Amino acid sequence: MTRRFVWASLVVSIVAGPLVIAPDAQSQTTGNAATPRTPDGKPDLSGMWGGGDGGRPVNEDDRGNVTDIFPSRRCGPTQVECGDYTNQSVDQEFTGRMDRSRPLYRPEHWDRVIYLDMNTNREDPIFKCQPQGIPRQGPPLKIVQTASEVIFFYGGGEDYRIIPIDGRTHNPVRARDVTYFGHAVGHWDGDTLVVDAVGFNDLTWLARGGYFHSDRLRVVERLRREGNVLHYQATVEDLEVLVEPWALTPRQLRLNTNLDAFIPEGEPCHDYDSQNMVTQIRH
């Protein structure tokens, strides 16, 4: 099992490391808050985001800090008390398979999906200290918005994306330089920020379950703020392996208004769960 700090999702992504931030007690008042806007009239997406409907699961330590836990059969060397949350068979692995939104692969690719799924502990790229990529990474933990760009920060601080929103289109040279997070540009569709990303490598999965993709992957993310609630939805297109675009389950996240909230520094990635990988016990 690798240690990598990521933003959690019950449906889309696998959490591979602990994330600790300040408690977000004030974020409960979301429905009646006014939507802040930038000087040009666009919704201001800036802030720390988490929890809410379809957001990350909330666990708290004895000091009230919100923590995300390794989905492993055993605790990591520096892990917070695991409790039952580490048993992937009864939480994320199970609930992830209950989601009705799943990618539909072309017939010739299903054998590979099944093989990767059955051999997850050996084949899943996140166990090799690789980034989760998009859309598996899920929504950002923190957004910083300016007039010309948005910056998405994810758990642990290692992964971030700088996305222009000044109307430019994809740079054809950079779009061919395949990466884990692709080449993204954004534009406003009314009050919704639309982020269009291409230029991915084929080294990540769309989600747990062996859901691989090709380097023809395209991901469109939509973010809309209503008061202190951020609505997030991603759609995947991959003409090489998918029959049709896959619309992931929408998520709602709440604004964390605690001024002490922070993103902890990431740590080196290690393999420590080799016994389970060898015995093929599912993560």
Where are these regions (language model features)?
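PEST-like low-complexity, intrinsically disordered acidic/proline/serine-rich tracts
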Residues: 2-11, 17-283
